[in-house]
Amino acid sequence: MPKLTHFDKKGRAKMVDVSKKGETLREAVVRGSIFMNPKTFKSILSGKIAKGDVLAVAKVAGIMAAKKTSEIIPMCHPLNLSHVEINFYPFEKESRIDIEAKVKIKAPTGVEMEGFVAVATAGLTIYDMCKAIDRGIVLSNIHLVKKTGGKSGTYTSKKFPSPGGRGITLLDKKL
């Protein structure tokens, strides 16, 4: 079992020293799902939510959150991210929207947590903008799909593979 690096010899929490680690290209893909009633789902996709364009706001919120991860998660290093991309995948039968964050950096530490914070924040933003019409919204299954780079190499989830396909972009919503 790998050693937990965020604890000292006495079991107290500490920030990992990454100063001697080399910079490598690191990427993380994190995904989560948000379930809602069919009316809310259709209202989001048709742009009929009173607070505005839900997915556009959720996208910006997710990107902003990724950049602020070290202010939320105590032992995360502050990072100058190279790229953050948020995509949404709608599934009408389940009244579900999958949220995916792709984060990239060349650094001595990974960006998985930035991906998790981006997905969670995008989902929470969707809830916030839609709670007036649907208090039963559920945000779930936030998980690491894939990570590359660093000493541990590549990890790809076998339990939650990415469904593929093309996500909704802001241009798609304007059609």
Spans of model-derived segments:
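C-terminal binding/interaction regions
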Residues: 1-55, 60-77, 83-160, 170-175
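Intrinsically disordered, glycine-rich low-complexity segments
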Residues: 163-167
